[in-house]
Amino acid sequence: DWGGLIGLRIAAEHEDRFKRILAANTFLPTGDYRSPDAFIEWQQFSQKTPVFKVGEIITSACVSDLSDDIRKAYDAPFPGEEYKAGARRFPMLVPIKPDDPASNPNRKAWEVLKKWDKPFLTAFSDSDPITRGGDAYFHKLIPGTKGQAHTTIIGAGHFLQEDKGEELAELTVDFINNNPVT
């Protein structure tokens, strides 16, 4: 789930290792602009809820109903609450203020991404309250988005791989095929 927040910085820091990027339901905030209320609520929930039910959290961010087996699979790595410290901490690593620790590294990444002319595709969903519409920011700032087949995936929440995995896979394959490495 942290592919954009981690992956976009890695791509910016190691441009030579990346030939194309597909960004889905993500953002790379610097804390310079107000975060969506839904994200602030998520941060607060992650810190205050006494029981952090990972499978239920994933399910709540999906449009489709996940099977009990899938929910259990998301819970499986965490045999007890004490094993969820990292999962609880991750939301707090996202900068929401200009002086947060990740703000400057994200700003540096944006300086690279604003010059990124390699293929860059966005595939956002229509039902993610945190990232919905965020693709427009990428389109405006990243030159590599020009001429790509950007899409809004209908009927999907935050976890595209769960709600519309096959559609996302097809988009990915098409993106790779339409932008061969030279």
Protein language model annotation of sequence segments:
Residues W2-T152, Q161, V173, N179-P180:
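Flexible "cap/lid" subdomain of the alpha/beta-hydrolase fold that forms the substrate-access gate
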Residues A156-A169:
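Catalytic histidine-centered segment of alpha/beta-hydrolase-like enzymes
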